[in-house]
Amino acid sequence: MVRQKNRYLLCEIIYIDGRRLHRNLQQRDIYHCVRNALAKEHGEYGVALALRSLSIQAYFHPNIVMIRVSRDAHKMLQSALFFIRKIGQYEAFFNTLHISGTIRTCQKFYVGYLRRELPKLLRECKTPEEEKEVKKAISSCVPVEVT
């Protein structure tokens, strides 16, 4: 059996209104947004090529998602992500932070990114609940899947 080669894109969701903290955004909203962008930019061919292995995993850090896609389709996915301006009901866009061939190197980059970014997020907390959530993330510094 031949190993399927994938690419992993670590992306940050940036909201137009400038807010950085968690929104009630579901993984299915992100998935449908990405799928629709692929269909719009690359048609049925792009969707069919990408959907073989398209998977989206949202992490505890409010605005980070990891997208898995086949190696053949990752450039199509990158170009489609550029045109996304609305995710679910929010005006937002994707900023690609890292592209990797393995999930392990992508997660290593993510842990380093968390160590740099979470202290900044702690300064922006407005409620004690938000502060407690961010402190918990800083102490663990491990990605957790959102369901």
Q: Where are the regions that the model predicts?
A:
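Helix N-cap motif at beta-to-alpha junctions
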Residues: R68-K75
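Conserved beta-strand -> loop -> alpha-helix junction used to position metal-binding or nucleic-acid-contacting
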Residues: E91-T105
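A common structural junction motif
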Residues: F83-A92
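Short active-site loop/helix that positions an aromatic residue
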Residues: Q78-L81
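Surface-exposed, low-hydrophobicity interaction/linker segments
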Residues: M1, I13-Q57
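C-terminal low-complexity, charged extensions that often adopt amphipathic alpha-helices
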Residues: M1-V2, L10, G101-T147
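The conserved glycine-aromatic submotif of the RRM
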Residues: Y59-M66
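Beta-strand cores of modular interaction/reader domains in eukaryotic scaffold and signaling proteins
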Residues: L10-E12, M66-R68, N95-L97
